[in-house]
């Protein structure tokens, strides 16, 4: 089993562990509840409709398939602006940046997705809110290789791609929330055929 698959399995286990811990805390029995906590819970459960959210996120990016044979695990960060079109549904547009080091050359591959997405948050009786997401958009891919101390060679391409994901979210203060999520990205291109990678990220959501 290659490194990418192992990393993927470990990442999924981490996400499952976080979800289980949060669920256990939610169902852990009676606890003292303050007025501020009750107000936060009411706001959290009232839904997304008519609200605008700014979300920022960052974490690890895991190459998959043939892509994992050429590059190493990288890092990613991004931001999105979303609007609640329903009680449980958010329509958003976002941009992100992912950078992967190369195995066999002194260089790196970067991926910049500019995507639109639909997120659906499942209602729950506790503080934990599971969600699923699907997105589509333009992915800018770039490979830079250092040929000599003064020369770099770069290939660039813009391709259409999609992403699918899931995760959990928890309220912090007011309508703010933090969460963790796992996403799969697939990009089809010519210079970069069938580029696949996974992301495990943590993020914060702020109402505007």
Regions found by a protein language model. Give the residues of each.
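Hydrophobic membrane-targeting alpha-helices
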Residues: 16-22, 121
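Extracellular carbohydrate recognition
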Residues: 195-197
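Short glycine/proline- and aromatic-enriched beta-strand/turn motifs that initiate or cap beta-hairpins
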Residues: 23-83, 199-207
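Bacterial N-terminal signal peptides
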Residues: 9-17
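Extracellular loop and loop/strand-boundary signature of outer-membrane beta-barrel proteins
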Residues: 64-67, 102-106, 148-154, 187-191
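Bacterial N-terminal signal peptides that target proteins for export
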Residues: 1-10
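Gram-negative (and chloroplast) outer-membrane scaffold detector with strong preference
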Residues: 44, 75, 80-149, 159-162, ...
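Transmembrane beta-strand segments that form the barrel wall of outer-membrane beta-barrel proteins
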Residues: 54-66, 91-101, 136-138, 178-188
């Amino acid at each position: 089993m290659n490194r990418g698959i192992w990393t993927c399995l470990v990442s999924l286990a981490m996400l499952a562990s976080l979800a289980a811990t949060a669920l256990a805390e939610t169902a852990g029995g009676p606890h003292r509840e303050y007025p501020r906590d009750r107000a936060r819970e009411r706001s959290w459960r009232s839904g997304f409709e008519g609200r605008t959210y700014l979300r920022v996120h960052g974490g690890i990016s895991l190459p998959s398939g043939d892509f994992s044979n050429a590059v190493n695990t990288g890092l990613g960060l991004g931001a999105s602006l979303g609007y609640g079109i329903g009680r449980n549904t958010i329509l958003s547009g976002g941009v992100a940046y992912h950078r992967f080091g190369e195995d066999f050359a002194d260089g790196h591959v970067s991926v910049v997705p500019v995507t639109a997405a639909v997120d659906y948050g499942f209602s729950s009786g506790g503080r934990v809110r599971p969600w699923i997401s699907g997105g589509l958009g333009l992915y800018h891919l770039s490979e830079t290789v250092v040929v000599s101390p003064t020369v770099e060679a770069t290939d660039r391409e813009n391709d259409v791609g999609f992403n699918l994901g899931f995760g959990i979210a928890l309220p912090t203060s007011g309508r703010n929330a933090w969460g963790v999520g796992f996403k799969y990205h697939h990009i089809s291109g010519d210079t970069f055929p069938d580029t696949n990678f996974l992301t495990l990220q943590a993020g914060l959501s702020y109402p505007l």
